Amino acid sequence: MSNKFKKILVTCALPYANGPIHIGHMLEHIQADIWVRYQRMRNNEVWFISSDDAHGTAIMLKSEKLGITPIKLIKKIKEEHIIDFSNFNISHDNYHSTHCVENLFLLRKIFLSLSEQKLINEKKIFQFYDNTKKMFLPDRFIKGTCPFCSSKNQNGDNCEICGSIYEPTDLVNPISVISNSVPILKNTTHLYFNLPLFTNMLNKWIHSGILEKSVAKKTEEWLKSGLKEWGISRDAPYFGFKIPKFDKKYFYVWLDAPVGYISAFKNFCTKNKKVDFNEFWKKESKCELYHFIGKDIIYFHTLFWPAILEASSYRKPNGIFVHGHLTINGLKLSKSRGFLIKASDWIKCFDSDSLRYYYASKLSNNINDIEINLEDFIQKINSDIVNKLVNLASRNASFIHKYFDGYLADSLGDCNLYQDFIDISKKIANFFENRQFSSVIRECMKLLDLANQYINQREPWKIKQDNFNKLHTICTVGINLFRLVVIFLKPIIPDLAKKTEYFLISDLTWKGIDKPLLSHKIKKFKKLYNRINHDKILQLSLLCK
């Protein structure tokens, strides 16, 4: 990694404001948060922004069902989302909502710019209409069979199985999600963004190194098959922002929501005058911008969104980091399908570091799905964190306080392990930089094996009183090796890192790894982490019913 100071803006896909955060959402926010925390440890200026996606038919219908206004619903949901993210130590610098004055202003500004450039076309089309509910059906309120791979129960705009994008009218055997009736086709008028005009620009952009190879390959397939104009409007009734000069037309959520990245940062800059909005979002910006997203929304972020940014004279992202779906026993977690584990239920059974660590042990920079197995989860946490990491501190700290009044020795003796760990830090830093968190975990476990082997071979518990200097040195080495590993894992397990800082009476910083703690007093060891019991699985399963 370059020593040059960087300015970085990081976003996650916006959670929808019609229900709770589940551990699938948390996968993405934990992945981004680990990367953000690492960048902060390297003294880069990093701003981590997210927001609730607060518009759409689903919110309108849910508020009607609850007998409250959409405004009250999204306010309540946002408060719940913020609590959930806080419980998992997601360090957002600002968490906003797309239902805000900043988003309204930016949407209208962008729409006016697109219109003036004649990039918006008005078309008469046939659209599915629910004759029972007397309303046009948005894409996500139509289910049917994918016209490309024949997967059943797919959305009206894209297939979660093969990733194909299509028109709702292409679906086989469509059904209205709202009334479960067969929709009819009805004439209406909509606005479309001229996406095909940006084909050459997008082709150059996706091959500029900003996408992982598998993501670039998938995007290239869509480009080769030909881009279509992109609908940016929806019919009333709808909860969202009205399109100026178009009666009963509203901005579609896939224009509204990504603009939320910009509006959330705009709101942040309003509250933090030292941060310059234009420095990060102007077209020629030297700052870095990264989007963390799931693989089901690649198309929107690698084609539609960069074209909108290009047309509106905003900068494009330096990278789009894509992760796979989260599965349990092979089934994808999905709020719309009712198969999920709420973050609020998880935190009642397990601490936040445990999920962060388990996710990190499976995360890399590819888009493979991530499988959750609760038995494996418990085994991994108890083995890695309790048996290897925390036990290393416990067994050495007891001698330090029993015989040396809590003070570490003044040297590490002739032990070369400390320098070996420092040498490995460059490799670990590279893994962090490239989001290969599972490799970070593997390297740290190798280091812990070496550290524990060092202690076991020297058997400090057998050393007699006439050789206390040797005992002092061995235990000081053990504590310092423990400290280094916790520094490496600090972005992943912040709660344990904080407890370790209290125990060691020392901040855990990346720049501090070159200087071991010598002639330094530490506190008496208190349990840093509790072993997880298997009865927690039953507790979680009961909460999820």
Swiss-Prot record:
Family of the protein in this entry: Belongs to the class-I aminoacyl-tRNA synthetase family. MetG type 1 subfamily.
GO MF: ATP binding; metal ion binding; methionine-tRNA ligase activity
Residues noted as binding ATP in the record, renumbered to the chain: K335
Cofactor stoichiometry and binding remark: Binds 1 zinc ion per subunit.
CDD domains: Anticodon_Ia_Met
Cofactor list: Zn(2+)
Motif ('HIGH' region): 15-25
Residue window of motif 'KMSKS' region: 332-336
SS bonds (residue pairs): none
Catalytic activity annotation: tRNA(Met) + L-methionine + ATP = L-methionyl-tRNA(Met) + AMP + diphosphate
First-level EC class: ligase
Residues the record lists as binding Zn(2+): C146, C149, C159, C162
Name of the protein in question: Methionine--tRNA ligase
Keywords attached to this entry: Aminoacyl-tRNA synthetase, ATP-binding, Cytoplasm, Ligase, Metal-binding, Nucleotide-binding, Protein biosynthesis, Zinc
Subunit structure: Monomer.
PANTHER family membership: METHIONINE--TRNA LIGASE, METHIONINE--TRNA LIGASE, CYTOPLASMIC
Any single GO BP term: methionyl-tRNA aminoacylation
GO CC aspect terms: cytosol
Role of this protein: Is required not only for elongation of protein synthesis but also for the initiation of all mRNA translation through initiator tRNA(fMet) aminoacylation.
Intracellular or extracellular location(s): Cytoplasm
Assigned EC number: 6.1.1.10
InterPro entries (UniProt xref): aa-tRNA-synth_I_CS, Anticodon_Met, Met-tRNA_ligase_1, Met-tRNA_synth, Methionyl/Leucyl_tRNA_Synth, MetRS_core, MetRS_Zn, Rossmann-like_a/b/a_fold
